[in-house]
């Protein structure tokens, strides 16, 4: 009871903002697996639209509450899905080869056959593109069949694509916090 009272007291000055309703779910929204969940798709769709990008990259997290169909999406819900200290959104140009390298590197952190080389985490979430993954293959051969979902065209290694994402570890990332962008 004391802890519940303390939490209520701390949240009280922020209640109007955190209880603000942003929308309502049509389906189950979650972030629970090693690969994309439906909340990841929502975040990636917002990145694609608001940053006018072909491909979206979002960090692989498995936190935040799962919402049932018909539940309200509040600002607090969104904050729980995007709660990190480096939330800024970027928009940049990347080659198909570099995008594949990112996916391969993260996949190796997860699926390396040597458990001492597995660094944990989750697969980077993607929007606007599809790919196949074979976790039994060695690094460099796990990711294949990369395609742009809007057109169905194959992602070419030498071609440049417009990519939006967030949670960059690069210093000086300029752009709005992801929670502001998704709230639109």
Label each PLM-derived region with a short phrase.
Residues 2-74:
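Hard-cation-handling environments
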Residues 1-17, 110-118, 122-125:
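Active-site-adjacent helix-turn-beta-strand microarchitecture at beta-sheet edges
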Residues 41-184:
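Feature captures C-terminal
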């Amino acid at each position: 009871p004391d802890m519940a009272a303390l939490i209520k007291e701390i949240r009280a000055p922020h209640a109007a903002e955190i209880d603000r309703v942003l929308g309502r779910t049509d389906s189950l929204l979650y972030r629970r697996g090693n690969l994309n969940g439906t909340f990841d798709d929502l975040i990636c769709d917002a990145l694609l639209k608001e940053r006018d990008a072909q491909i979206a990259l979002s960090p692989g997290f498995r936190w935040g509450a799962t919402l049932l169909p018909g539940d309200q999406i509040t600002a607090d819900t969104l904050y729980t899905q995007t709660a990190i200290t480096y939330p800024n959104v970027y928009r940049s140009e990347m080659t198909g080869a570099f995008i594949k390298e990112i996916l391969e590197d993260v996949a190796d952190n997860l699926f390396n056959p040597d458990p001492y080389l597995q660094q944990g985490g989750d697969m980077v979430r993607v929007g606007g593109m599809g790919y196949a993954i074979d976790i039994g293959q060695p690094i460099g051969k796990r990711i294949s069949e990369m395609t742009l979902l809007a057109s169905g065209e194959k992602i070419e290694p030498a071609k440049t694509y417009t990519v939006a994402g967030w949670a960059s570890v690069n210093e000086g990332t300029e752009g709005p916090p992801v929670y502001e962008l998704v709230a639109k």
